[in-house]
Design a protein with these regions (language model features):
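Active-site hotspot residues in diverse enzymes, especially metal/ion-binding acidic/histidine motifs
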Residues: 2-425
């Protein structure tokens, strides 16, 4: 199998083939080698940030007429020039190897915010992660097509059971039945609980990514989802607390089950009147029921001991009761309210205190900056495994794999190890 597209080869116009892939970073390939890309994708990327061809040429550092020549197909950029264009256009290099401009990239109506946050212009980081989610999905579909395979569809439930408690029960059973990892129980860490649910969703056919390097603040976005009948995408925020990511993950899965885009935030309004607020409250309730089934919650010794002492909960007792479910004390307390085991007034009075203590504990327990682990988390461990497995089996060559993963060829093996099922996300 050839390792790299060679000068003079014809430009692809159909699906992305293994020999079309070019490396992303310096892996020993001369930077002057032409990058065989689709001109219309170059034009789309430039126009998406409102640059003229001349302005783009100057930012990229080429003659004023060069970008126009690329977009007309008269000339092609070199690898080095394409890397620079990717930086200028704020796009992943992999997007330039799509066969056509992606559609509908900049119309996200689904993202989840902290209480008190207000809608406003997206940050550059949110734009980039949203676009990256679309690109990675397209590339994953290319890999399935190359192997003449269909993405899993186990995440879907049709028809939807009613009421929502039945839907949550069916969803939990469906995901865990096919999950490659068991639930860790009360002795498991927050990372292990998150890892289990991420792996379950990926196995069922949902791509799970993270906002790159935590560059999007949680005050702007906690998570968002892209609904598709085939291979939908959930993006959580890598800067969020581990248990917060877990709840956001299942909240977005609830949106996918309901075939909705969301308008997500973290707040459940008891008196919600607008359709969007009711939808958010409903998705929160479904997520809580998936993670914390009623029977299992009520069977907890800490819960049974307080049937007649509803206001006797302390932070430590809540933490002990919440541990088997991998959720925060605040989320568990809210679940007790929904199940009629704690008064709403007690929850309101303690919520801010418990959130502050939980966030302080999470901050102290955050791990170091392992690049491979963080990159596998951001790209999505399932996506990394999909690409690295295709490379290992020679379905794609090394440079295509490097492009899809945005790494050096020499880094693919260690990144694949970081994406192993049992490694933390």
């Amino acid at each position: 199998m050839p390792e790299l597209s060679v000068p003079g080869m014809s430009r692809h116009t159909g699906t992305l083939t293994p020999s079309d892939g070019l490396l992303v970073q310096d892996v020993g390939v001369p930077a002057s080698i032409p990058a065989i890309v689709e001109p219309s994708v170059l034009r789309w990327a430039r126009e998406s940030i409102d640059l003229t061809p001349v302005a783009a040429s100057r930012k990229i550092g080429v003659p004023d007429d060069r970008v126009a020549a690329w977009e007309s197909g008269e000339e092609v950029p070199t690898i080095a020039q394409l890397r620079k264009a990717a930086d200028v256009y704020k796009r992943s290099l992999a997007v330039f190897f799509l066969a056509a401009p992606p559609a509908g990239f900049d119309t996200l109506r689904d993202f989840r915010r902290h209480e008190g946050a207000t809608a406003g212009p997206w940050s550059q980081g949110l734009h980039e992660d949203y676009r990256r989610a679309h690109v990675q999905r397209d590339l994953a579909l290319e890999l399935y097509e190359l192997e003449d395979a269909e993405p899993p569809s186990g995440w879907q439930i049709s028809p939807l059971p009613s009421p929502d408690d039945a839907l949550a029960s069916a969803a939990r059973q469906r995901l865990l039945a096919g999950a490659p990892l068991p639930l860790p129980g009360g002795s498991g860490t927050a990372y292990e609980h998150l890892n289990t649910w991420v792996a379950a969703l990926e196995t069922a056919g949902v791509m799970v990514l993270a906002a790159s390097g935590g560059r999007v603040p949680t005050s702007e976005m906690r998570a968002f989802s892209l609904y598709f009948d085939v291979l939908p995408v959930i993006v959580v925020n890598g800067a969020d607390a581990t248990r917060g990511r877990l709840f956001s993950l299942l909240h977005e899965y609830a949106h996918l089950l309901l075939h909705t885009g969301g308008l997500c935030d973290t707040v459940t309004d008891a008196g919600a009147t607008s359709p969007d607020r009711r939808l958010e409250a409903r998705c929160n309730a479904i997520a809580a029921a998936i993670l914390m089934p009623q029977a299992a919650v009520l069977a907890q010794p800490e819960v049974q001991a307080r049937v007649n002492a509803r206001a006797s909960w302390t932070y430590s007792s809540l933490a002990a009761a919440a541990a088997p479910f991998g959720v925060s004390t605040e989320a568990f307390l809210r679940r007790l309210v929904d199940l009629g085991r704690v008064d709403p007034g007690f929850y309101s009075a303690r919520r801010e205190e418990y959130l502050a203590r939980y966030e302080d504990e999470e901050a102290k327990s955050q791990g170091g900056g392992d690049w491979y682990r963080n990159t596998a988390r951001d790209l999505g461990k399932g996506y990394v495994r999909l690409v690295s497995d295709a490379y290992r089996r020679r379905v794609i060559d090394s440079y295509t794999a490097a492009t899809y993963l945005n790494v050096k060829v020499s880094q693919i093996s260690r990144l694949a190890q970081a994406a192993a099922l049992r490694n933390a996300v």
